[in-house]
Amino acid sequence: MPNINDMTVGSPTRDIIKFAVPLIGGYILQQMYLIIDAAIVGQFIGVNALAAVGASSSIMFLIMGFCNGSCAGFAIPVAQEFGAKEYSKMRAYVANALRIVAVIAVVITAVTAIFCEHILKLVNTPDDIFHDAYLFLLLNFLAIPFTMSYNILAGFIRSLGDSKQPFYFLIAASLLNIALDFILIIGLGMGVEGAGIATMTAQAFASALCWTYIRKHLRILIPTGGERAYDDKKTCLLYTSPSPRDRSLSR
């Protein structure tokens, strides 16, 4: 089966290095969304718009750290069952993890969107940039389902030993984000709202690439029949898997 790397055989050191390099690159690229937005906004709109994006960045880093860490943790049992060659159990974990992620994404999106204004007031956002900061942050909050979708699907792909494909997908999404920034901010004059829409679209694109790749090349991950059923024990294990990681990433 293509692009499945059995990391239980061969040199552990070599496999870890080969796996880790694209993984680290991927985390850097995910942070680049905000950096790219800030650079283009600051260059072509002005200081206030740049400050608005900057005011949102620390908030987004905190929330995205939690989301990313959770999704990475949910992929751990999937990787363990793949290594044990228990493929039916692996797919059952995939199904239950997707349910949990869907619930978390909806809840976090709803809560952050509703309290977006209060969050900005809590961090003492200046009045002259408040409107732009609100628009940018709200659009990023609304993109949380796409972000979590990418992270969980990328986690499943990495569970099979392939950290390169998710990295390539992030490169493509980052290029799309840059292109949309220029089109929406400069071409259409949409300001920070354009930057937020560009980021949301890029994250949705990365998620779609992961899903398409799994459908075409990694059907071993797709649950069928009884594997889709809700499982209390597996759900509890999935809930406990990400705890230390998501806390560390959201500090």
Task: Give the residues covered by each predicted segment.
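Interfacial/gating helices of multi-pass transporter permease domains
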Residues: 41-61, 127-132, 192-193, 236-238
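Residue-level signal for short hydrophobic patches within transmembrane helices
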Residues: 13-32, 59, 63, 142
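Alpha-helical transmembrane segments of multi-pass membrane transporters/permeases
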Residues: 101, 156-179, 193, 197-200
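Short alpha-helical transmembrane segments in multi-pass integral membrane proteins
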Residues: 1-20, 78-143, 187-238
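Conserved small/polar residues in nucleotide/adenosyl-binding loops
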Residues: 239-246
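Generic alpha-helical transmembrane segments of integral inner-membrane proteins
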Residues: 24, 28, 32, 36, ...
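Transmembrane alpha-helix boundary and packing residues in multipass membrane permease domains
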Residues: 23, 27, 39, 76, ...
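Small-residue-rich hydrophobic transmembrane alpha-helices
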Residues: 50-110, 147-166
